[in-house]
């Protein structure tokens, strides 16, 4: 039995005697019909979509889709040369594979259109990898997306590594109706999709029932498929509901972990399908500005725009993906003397004017986005803007060392200079008070004292965005005590699922009986992300005498967690979690296999290597411990932690 199945079987031994029926995998959803079918009626929308990034998110290689120079040219980076050429009508990339041998791979797919285009190669049947030398569409050149930081072979971030497996990490957001179909036993993929590229049905849902309605609307009294509307679609955007629209976009435009299979039916609530990353160090700056490749949703949730009901389509055409107006006009549709009656909280005022921005009209400094949407560059050349739409806070940047939009242009000046300038120009501004970023920065620096109280205060402040409050609770995890967990317990009933899930996680710090009592309501929470957070805390809890209703809720939540783990059996992170679970359940051999699978996928996971060494030592397998350490050092020869373990084993 593969160890992932063994582990989940052990997990469910906890529920012996409790009746639990796994959620059925039914065929009660409509079938996909393809974007070409949709275009038969929706011509204008289809025409706008044809030139969009969505339409070109994943394409078959061919003369009309491949823009890179495959004319036999070479590209050398850090001493390794890659050749791009064609043969027998195919496009090929010749490069060094993991064993160090040169090998030619046929291009199996094309990803993206601008500002760069990447190419997919099949390294084994059914498994696609994203090649890291990409085509720069602007300068018409090959370049490495990591620049001087290019990872070496055997690194998890190398183009052959698990974090670059298209099937696992990318395809669900570059295709319509994608099914990964990873077999943990054979470690093989048999992926399939309804359509490559992000087609109509990726957002609107499978169209079988809708086309039946379109053919005979008079005869279409009721959809034969549960969960579809009067026109046969699983999601209805016509009502203009913010949650419906924004959460549909957020499924891909966010840094998140899939709870389901990564391909939820459109209309599925975000927190039933995903767990959103909080404002963690390495992902976001302390003040919430984007840092790593976190996409849009996490920053948009911090914005006043989101808080006041703004939807993606207020600024972006949903079919072309382009802004609905040029330049500042996209902002002045609301931020102007006439304001916009759809958003009554707006202040009617002249913004697109030197009296507000203090720059020459027509210059970059006069553009709203220059001051309110700071830009970061990813993948070497891809500039993306922060969607928290924040008021510049150079005073905060001077304190925390966070980016300041003023200094993006005025590079010769300091943040303190910019703060002084803004104070002169806006002497009565209300935007210079305390900020959660100050608390987060102190917590990240492991400041002691009252920082726990400060984080709790942020978490309890209902006027802060939910993602900020949840992030405060997340920062409490390393310093949590039973007292802090008790203080946070009331937030398990918070209106925001991000806050509820984070408050549940903190209850790990309290005694088992008390913990169980607190998390019981969360096992039946409306959001799956909260239920799964509660299920994680059931291991070791006194569940033997649960009332039947409570036991069923616990079994359901645990089943959802089990399914979430199984859906990510090709992720190294999953096996780290699995190994930890096995240790809690006192199954050392299962734990070793889990940690070994994690390091097979990503040899740079030093902690997983160390756990293998420690467990083997604990069970008296010194030879196995020595062998695991040797393998760990081969992959990480300079790691000080592993070097220390070598000295310890040598004694």
Q: Model-found features: residue ranges?
A:
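Amphipathic alpha-helical scaffolding segments comprising HEAT/armadillo-like alpha-solenoid repeats
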Residues: 448-459, 481-493, 511-522, 545-562
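Structural detector for internal amphipathic alpha-helices that build alpha-solenoid repeat scaffolds
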Residues: 435-446, 467-480, 490, 498-512, ...
């Amino acid at each position: 039995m593969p160890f992932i199945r063994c582990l989940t079987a052990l997990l469910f031994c906890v529920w012996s005697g409790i009746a639990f029926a796994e959620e059925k995998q039914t065929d009660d959803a409509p079938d996909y019909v393809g974007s070409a079918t949709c275009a038969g009626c929706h011509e204008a929308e289809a025409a706008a979509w044809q030139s969009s990034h969505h339409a070109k998110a994943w394409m078959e290689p061919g003369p009309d889709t491949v823009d890179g120079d495959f004319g036999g040219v070479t590209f050398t980076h850090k001493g390794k040369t890659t050749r791009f050429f064609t043969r027998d009508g195919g496009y090929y990339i010749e490069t060094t594979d993991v064993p160090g041998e040169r090998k030619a791979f046929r291009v199996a797919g094309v990803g993206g259109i601008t500002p760069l285009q990447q190419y997919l190669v099949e390294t084994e049947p059914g498994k696609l990898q994203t090649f890291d030398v990409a085509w720069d569409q602007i300068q018409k050149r090959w370049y490495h997306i990591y620049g001087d930081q290019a990872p070496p072979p055997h690194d998890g971030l190398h183009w052959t590594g698990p974090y670059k497996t298209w099937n696992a990490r990318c395809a669900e957001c570059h295709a319509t109706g994608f099914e990964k179909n990873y077999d943990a036993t054979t470690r093989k993929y048999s992926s399939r999709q309804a359509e490559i590229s992000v087609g109509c049905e990726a957002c609107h849902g499978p169209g079988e029932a809708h086309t039946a309605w379109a053919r005979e609307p008079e005869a279409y009294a009721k959809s034969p498929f549960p969960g579809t509307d009067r026109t046969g679609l699983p999601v209805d955007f016509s009502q203009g509901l913010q949650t419906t629209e924004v959460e549909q976009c957020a499924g891909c435009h966010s840094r998140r972990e899939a709870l389901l299979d990564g391909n939820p039916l459109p209309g599925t609530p975000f927190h039933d399908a995903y767990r959103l990353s909080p404002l963690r160090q390495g992902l976001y700056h302390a003040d919430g500005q984007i840092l790593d490749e976190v996409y849009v949703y996490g920053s948009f949730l911090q914005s006043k725009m989101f808080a006041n009901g703004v939807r993606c389509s207020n600024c972006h055409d949903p079919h072309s993906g382009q802004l609905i107006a040029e330049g500042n006009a996209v902002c002045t549709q609301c931020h102007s003397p006439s304001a916009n009656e759809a958003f009554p909280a707006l202040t009617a005022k002249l913004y697109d004017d030197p009296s507000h921005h203090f720059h020459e009209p027509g210059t970059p400094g006069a553009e709203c986005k220059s001051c309110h949407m700071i830009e970061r560059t990813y993948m070497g050349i891809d500039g993306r803007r922060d969607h928290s739409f924040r008021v510049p806070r150079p005073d905060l940047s001077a304190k925390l060392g966070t980016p300041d939009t003023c200094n993006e242009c005025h590079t010769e000046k300091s943040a303190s200079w910019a703060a002084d300038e803004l104070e002169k120009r806006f002497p009565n501004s209300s935007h210079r008070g305390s900020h959660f970023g100050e608390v987060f920065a102190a917590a990240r620096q492991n400041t002691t004292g009252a920082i726990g109280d400060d984080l709790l205060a942020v978490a309890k402040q209902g006027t802060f965005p939910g993602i900020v409050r949840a992030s405060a609770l997340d920062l409490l995890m390393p310093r949590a005590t039973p007292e802090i967990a008790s203080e946070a317990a009331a937030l398990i009933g918070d209106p925001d699922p991000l806050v509820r899930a984070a408050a549940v996680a903190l209850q790990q710090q309290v005694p088992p009986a008390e913990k169980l009592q607190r998390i019981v309501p969360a096992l039946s929470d409306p959001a799956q992300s909260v239920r799964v957070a509660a299920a994680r805390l059931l291991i070791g809890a006194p569940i033997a005498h649960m009332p039947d209703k409570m036991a069923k809720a616990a079994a359901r939540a645990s089943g959802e967690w089990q399914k979430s783990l199984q859906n990510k059996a090709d992720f190294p992170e999953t096996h780290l979690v699995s190994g930890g679970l096995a240790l809690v359940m006192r199954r050392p051999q299962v734990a070793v296999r889990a940690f070994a699978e994690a390091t097979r996928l990503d040899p740079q996971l030093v902690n997983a290597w160390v756990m293998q060494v420690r467990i083997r030592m604990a069970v008296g397998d010194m030879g196995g411990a020595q062998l695991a350490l040797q393998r760990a050092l081969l992959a990480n020869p300079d790691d000080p932690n592993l070097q220390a373990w070598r000295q310890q084993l040598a004694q």
